[in-house]
Amino acid sequence: MSETKHTLHTPGWVSDFQKFIMRGNVLDLAVGVVIGAAFSAIVGSAVKDILTPFIGLITGGVDFSNLFITLKGPVKDTLAEAQKAGAVTVNIGVFLNAVIQFLIIAFFIFWLTRILSKLSRKQEAAPAAPPAPTKEEVLLTEIRDLLAQKNS
């Protein structure tokens, strides 16, 4: 039974951790989380700054960010004022913005995975060109052809 000896400077867990981190799926996951966080900020801004005003325009000027119900406390015109006054509120507009953000992210991810899936299927479907024959194969083919000519 062989034993792996580790020096004082490189304990066994360091190499195990390196193997774990260098696995492809761990790196892919880390990249996905970072890109997802950045994309979430972009989508959040798109919903808040671009889509919500249009939806508010269509619905007669309703500002979703200030759509709330006061359960307890002073009734105020805006959510910020109500929260500052200590009112207990149900923030319907904030929830609607989160739902819209989720739907946009889900829609984008759906199309992204669909496109990537089609691209990977096309790459798999394209047959690889056969490798060029080696020198030995060319020589053997020539010998075979010469023997076939000699025997005919």
From Swiss-Prot:
Pfam families listed in its UniProt record: MscL (PF01741)
Protein localization: Cell inner membrane
Ion transport found in the keyword field: yes
Domain of life: Bacteria
Gene3D superfamilies in alphabetical order: Large-conductance mechanosensitive channel, MscL, domain 1
GO MF terms, alphabetically ordered: mechanosensitive monoatomic ion channel activity
Keywords associated with the record: Cell inner membrane, Cell membrane, Ion channel, Ion transport, Membrane, Transmembrane, Transmembrane helix, Transport
InterPro entries: Mechanosensitive_channel_CS, MS_channel, MSC/AndL, MscL_channel
Keyword Transmembrane: yes
GO cellular component terms listed in the entry, alphabetical order: plasma membrane
Transmembrane segments: 26-46, 50-70, 92-112
Membrane topology of the entry: Multi-pass membrane protein
Coiled coil: none
HAMAP family for the chain: MscL (MF_00115)
Function: Channel that opens in response to stretch forces in the membrane lipid bilayer. May participate in the regulation of osmotic pressure changes within the cell.
Summary of subunit composition and partner proteins: Homopentamer.
Family from the record: Belongs to the MscL family.
Protein name per the record: Large-conductance mechanosensitive channel
Gene that this sequence comes from: mscL
